[in-house]
Amino acid sequence: MKKFVIFTDSAADLPKSMVKDLDINYLGLICNIDNTEYIDNIDSELTPKAFYNKLREGIMPSTSQVNSFRFVEAFEEYVKQGISILYLAFSSALSGTYNSSLIAREELLEKYPDADIKIVDTRAACLGQGLLVYYAAQMKKDGKSIDEIYSWVEENKNKLCHYFTVDSLDHLKRGGRISSTAAAIGSLLSIKPMLYVNDAGELHNFAKAKGRKKSLKMLFQELEKRIVNPNEQTIFIAHSDCVEDAETLAEMIREKYPVKDILIDYIGIVIGSHTGIGTLAVFFLGDTKEP
C-alpha cells in the first residue's frame, strides 16, 4: 500500500494533542489583530483564551486564507519523496483556501507529473471539518488506503451535521449575515439565531431561540432529529469561551445517548473572528446535513 499523509488547515480547530497523536499535517490560516499577523497553527503564540479577551476589549480582527505558495512549500516536501497527499479543506463557500490548494496542485503536477495529491472540499468548518479529519486519521491508523479514505470522506461529508448558536449578533451584522436593524432588535429581545452549514458548505439560519437556555435545548433537539448510530459516534462540541454551556450540552447528550466520546474544545482564532464570543456548536454524523 502506498505511503500517504493527511493534511488539513486550521479552520478544522482540532486540539493540539489530537493533531500530534494522529500525525495530521496542519496549515494555519492567518488572523490579523491591530496590524499584527498571527498564523493560526497548533503552536500559535495567541491562545484562544487570550484572543477572546481581546474581542472583549473591542478589537475587531480580520482573517486571510492559506495562499498557494504555502501549499506548494508544504506539499512538495512529501511529493518529492513519492508520498501521496490527502488534504481535507475548509469549505470553499467560506474561504479561498481550497482554491489555493488546487492552484498549488497544478503547479506541483507540472514539476512532478506522477504526484498523487487528493483534495477534498469538505464543505465543512470548525470541528465539523475537524471531525471528518479525525475519522480520516482513525481510518489511516486502522490500515485503510488513501483511496478508501478519500471515498469515505466524499460519501459522508454531506452527513456531517453542523448546528450552532451565537450569543451576540454583532459579528453576524459585521459580516453582512443580518442587517443592523435585525441585530438591534434581536439584541433587545434576547433572540439567539440558530444556524447550520448546508450541503454547499454555506452558513444559513434555520430558527431563532428566545434566550440562551432555549438555544441550547434547540441544539440538542436538532441532534435528536438527525443523529444515526449514536453509540458508534464521537461527537465534537466547540465553543468561543463559554465552556460551561458546552459542558451542559454534552451532559444533555450523555443522558440520552451512549456515545463513544464527546470532545469539547475552543473555536479557534480564525473561525472565532467571524462568530464572536459565546458561540456554541455541535458536530456529528446524521442522516442529512439539512435541518
Swiss-Prot record:
Residues 4-286 form the DegV domain. Hexadecanoate binds at T63, S95. Keywords: Lipid-binding. It holds the Pfam family DegV. It comes from the Bacteria. GO terms for molecular function: lipid binding. InterPro entries: DegV, DegV_C, DegV_domain_contain. The keyword Cell wall biogenesis/degradation does not apply. Gene3D superfamilies: 3.30.1180.10, degv family protein (2.20.28.50), Dihydroxyacetone kinase, domain 1 (3.40.50.10440). May bind long-chain fatty acids, such as palmitate, and may play a role in lipid transport or fatty acid metabolism. PANTHER family: DEGV DOMAIN-CONTAINING PROTEIN DR_1986-RELATED, DEGV DOMAIN-CONTAINING PROTEIN YITS. This is DegV domain-containing protein CPE0026.
